[in-house]
Amino acid sequence: MKKYFITFGGGHQNFIDAGNRLTHQAKQLDIFDNVILFTDEILKTEHADTFWDKHGKFIEENKRGYGYWLWKPYIIQHVMKTLDDGDILMYLDAGCEILQHKREKILEYMKYVESEQIIGSKTAV
């Protein structure tokens, strides 16, 4: 079983910086096999034919949520398609923080996911 962490930082330098900070925090936990930061540049280049060509104009015309968060289900689904059964995916918004002293709590949640399949939360750990 592999554990993946993803976030998105794009649209404005503040969000790119927040995404970089968050992926750094995720790597420091030493829990995840793969930590992925999606950016607007990645959507425009690596996902041009599957996402950007269709939604780019809307995103650029609607600044709030970088296109009303249209990218969020896309990046989650994109990564989920690559997972094997039993793998775990954790997504956090770039404005979140991962506190190192919460590592054990995150591992506890991952054990819960093994039996319950999914956890959703509107607040951080």
Predicted feature locations:
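Short aromatic/hydrophobic "clamp" motif used to bind/position activated sugar donors
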Residues: 89
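N-terminal anchoring/stem segment of glycosyltransferases
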Residues: 1-69, 76-85
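Conserved donor-nucleotide/metal-binding helix-loop-beta segment in metal-dependent transferases, i.e.
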Residues: 96-125
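Active-site flanking residues adjacent to catalytic metal/cofactor-binding acidic residues
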Residues: 92-94
